[in-house]
Amino acid sequence: MARAAALFSLATGLSRIVGLLREVLVAYVFGVRGAINQFTIASQVPNVVRSLVADAALGAAFIPVFNELLERGEERRAWRVASTVATLSFLGLAAVTGLTMVFAEPLLGVFYSGAVPHLTVQLMWVLMPTVVLLGFAGIVQAILNSLGEFFVPAVAPVLWNVVIAVGLLYAITVDEPSTALLVYAWATLAGTLVQVLLPLPWLRGRQGRLTIAFHWRDSAVRRVFVLM
């Protein structure tokens, strides 16, 4: 337990250090004003959607239900519930993401008094899929935490920051500010994908059995969404 706590603290500290490096690179590449404001605005909509439907609430609602089923010896049902929650969450978030991308310009219009720059719309299109990816990642990390694995979920944000930092280093070589911003956005999406994929081998190592499932009539599935 002490070793696990030490590794978790190490990963958390490393994540903060790399995150600080990422912010330094952002300031170096784009400055603190000007073009970077378009990225900041473009990220507001996915951030709001995440905070409403895909952030910590889903994991917090899922963990007690999943743990309760495991403690009662209902392991097969626990994984069935986990698979259903993951499937329904993925489809729901994908639908929300798709609608948000379709109506990107009017949604971003609340931040502008005039016309919305096309670059801001492009940036939002690139960033919106992070909502789906982080929603799924939250479920995987919640499962690992329930199974006593804390280090890997703590390391995932480190690699997220590293991937973005690599993208920013490449952006330094780009002369066109709009292209550099798109590189930053794509690096953010790529980092989020890495954050999703990293824990999956450990999930399989814990006999994780996430599959596509639609057992929405299960009372445990309904409890998860009610608790959200």
Description of each model-found segment:
Residues 1-228:
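Membrane-embedded alpha-helical bundles of multi-pass transporters/translocases
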